[in-house]
């Protein structure tokens, strides 16, 4: 009876212990607790999830604004802002465009630049950018977080953090990167160091913050860093 009562108490206490795992590793049998990250939490770490059929652009933009500029915005906030100057009927059928994103960013005092770049210069992109890709026949906007020699890391508003082979990424990418520029950019933001895929043992390259000179080459100005 005593054991059954103890089990019942542990079950009732379960919700308050969610996300933690007890580890008996201390001398004398003391218990410590370690935060446990679910597969879903890891998949969408640092990303804004897409909630509607037409809002991948808004979710991708909100991800960059939250993580790289520490702005308190979510997908709904960005959608409302972009709809002010967008064709709402066109948005419902085709989604937002990069022009809609550009107008929204300018309305909040930021800048946007679109660059057409080739595969050979992909490694020169040192900031998180919005890109349009086709994955499994589905075209939508994602955040390109980081490019390496053989891999490209993306933050997909629907699928979460993904690592694509360079060839797979290039096959679905239209060659354009959309950069968000402005004051308060965090040069060590989390998007530049995406989660290691669950199937990978280690990363090939360690994260290194980008210097001012590299950022200015991409469109930032000196006052953005103060």
From Swiss-Prot:
InterPro entries with a match to the protein in the record: Peptidase_C39
Disruption phenotype: Deletion of just fapD in an overexpressing strain yields cells without amyloid fibrils. Deletion of the entire fapA-fapF six-gene locus shows no visible growth phenotype.
EC number(s) stated in the UniProt entry for this protein: 3.4.22.-
One of the record's GO molecular function terms: ATP binding
Keywords of the record: ATP-binding, Hydrolase, Nucleotide-binding, Periplasm, Protease, Signal, Thiol protease
Catalytic residues (UniProt): 56
Signal peptide: 1-18
Entry's localization field: Periplasm
Pfam families assigned: Peptidase_C39
GO cellular component: membrane; periplasmic space
Record flagged with keyword Transcription regulation: no
UniProt GO BP: proteolysis
Function: Probable cysteine protease that is involved in processing fibril precursors. Upon overexpression of the endogenous six-gene locus (fapA-fapF) in situ, cells form large clumps during liquid growth, make large amounts of biofilm and produce amyloid fibrils. Expression of the 6 gene operon in E.coli strain BL21(DE3) induces flocculation and biofilm formation with copious extracellular fibrils.
Record has Signal as a keyword: yes
Main enzyme class: hydrolase
Family note: Belongs to the FapD family.
Gene that encodes the chain: fapD
Broad class of where this protein is predominantly found: periplasm
Protein name listed in UniProt: Probable functional amyloid protease FapD
Residue ranges occupied by any Peptidase C39 domain in the UniProt entry: 50-180
